[in-house]
Each structure stands twice: as C-alpha cells, then as structure tokens.
Amino acid sequence: FRRVEDREEVEPVDLDALPTAGQGDREAFEAELDSLQDQLAEWQRALYAERRRSLLIVLQAMDAGGKDSTIRKVFRGVNPQSIRVASFKEPTALEREHDFLWRIHQQTPSTGMISIFNRSHYEDVLVVRVDRIVPESTWRERFDQINDFEARLAASGTTILKFFLHISPEEQAKRFRDRLQRPAKNW
C-alpha cells in the first residue's frame, strides 16, 4: 500500500485473483484468511481503543463482482459492534432531495469505527455519466466534490481504502447463471 497524494494520477494494479473454491490449495487459503482475520480483529480493537482515527473501506464492482461475499468472508471475525456496512443502491426520493453526497456522509465512520461501502459515491459519477442522466458539467463537478469530500475525511482522521473487484464479462455471465440455480440469490 502507499498513500495517494491529493489529485495524484494512479495507475490500476494488476494482481492475480485469490484462489477460489476448487482452485489451488483451499486449506492453505483458509488458514491464511483465518490468520489475516485475527490480525484485522486486533487492528479493529486498537482503532476502537484509540478513538482518534477511523477506517472507510470502499468496495466497487460490477453486478456479481463479489462485494457481498468479500464483506462476509473477510470481516467475519471482526466485532460487529464497531463495524457498519452501507450498501448504496439507487437513491431514494428523500436522498434525491439532497446533494449527492448527503446519503454518503451519513454512513462515514465515527472515530474508532470501521465503515464498509458496498458501492459508493463513485456511482454518482459512473452511472450518471454512462447512462447520460446528468449533463457532463454536472458529473465533472462531482469529481471535484468527491475529491474535496475525501480530503475532508482524511483530514479528520479517516483512512480510506478503495478496492475495485474486477471480473471478466465471462465470469460475470457465469455468476449470473449460477444465481438462477440458487434460490437464496433470486430476490
């Protein structure tokens, strides 16, 4: 990891995906995940005890990209009393009556806490740009507003970790087909 300075251009990192069920040594993967979860739980306790900083984890991905399962698997050993998961779907009528960051700001972590965003404020520039919902001047201005918003969070002691979980179009199609076969996923 490295700190990204204000408005610095960042190149995406190309990492091999972690092993998934049925690939590689599953037992070794689970043992490593358990060890990392223990370490994460220790960090969470220290963050909570210190009460000076907070952590915001932002997960972005296409539909079926693994956001929910990542949250369930990675954070299963963390004390649920000091962690909050916020999922950002299409804005409600009330949320649309406010500026686009209003609903996001309400979910940011207080000191000593961890917030995980399942999707985020980036939807308000990505979706509206791709679907041409707002004029270009609006989404361009939102980029600056997001940068300013995140700078304020960082200045107040919030560390922001951003992850884009990428899957190929073929993997996405496979996951959609798998969902059709699993009643718990058909909602």
Which sequence ranges carry the predicted segments?
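Glycine-rich phosphate-binding loop of ATP-dependent small-molecule kinases
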Residues: F1-W187
